[in-house]
Amino acid sequence: MELTYKKATIEDLDLLTETRIKVLRAANQLSDKEDMKEVEKESYHYYQKALLDGSHIAYLVFDRERFVGTGGVCFFQVMPTYHNPCGKKAYIMNMYTLPEYRRRGIAAKTLDMLVKDAWNKGIRAISLEATDMG
């Protein structure tokens, strides 16, 4: 196994969008017959805007040339609170590893990179929802 972790850029829109649909199908137990065209289109536009304005960071993981995993974090603002005076928050999402690559620390390393990105932006309020898959 020869893993590389790449911060996604605008050139990765197609792969990010394709992976987002895979994650949603898996997390929601949707068949390939379920129409996801609208979600796919909106996901593409989301990544297009968010990658450029810095409100989303994603990592792509490859074993040599083969895509094997991903993870992302979106940044947003809420009203300031006592415990979060800046109001900045991060939401980790779209964590995915190909089944045959699971239990090898790929998601853990990706998660660590995403948390570090949030901390580097001064964000301390970070959340993540997990599915039954992990």
Which ranges hold each PLM region?
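Conserved beta-strand in the GNAT
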Residues: 60, 66-75, 91, 96
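Conserved GNAT-fold acetyl-CoA-binding loop/helix
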Residues: 24-46
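Conserved N-terminal entry element of GNAT/NAT acetyltransferase domains
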Residues: 1-11, 22
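Conserved acetyl-CoA binding element of GNAT-fold acetyltransferases
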Residues: 83-99
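A short helix-loop-beta-strand connector motif used in the catalytic cores of GNAT acetyltransferases and
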Residues: 45-60
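Conserved acetyl-CoA pyrophosphate-binding loop and the N-cap/start of the following alpha-helix
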Residues: 101, 105-113
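Conserved GNAT acetyl-CoA-binding A-motif
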Residues: 111, 118-131
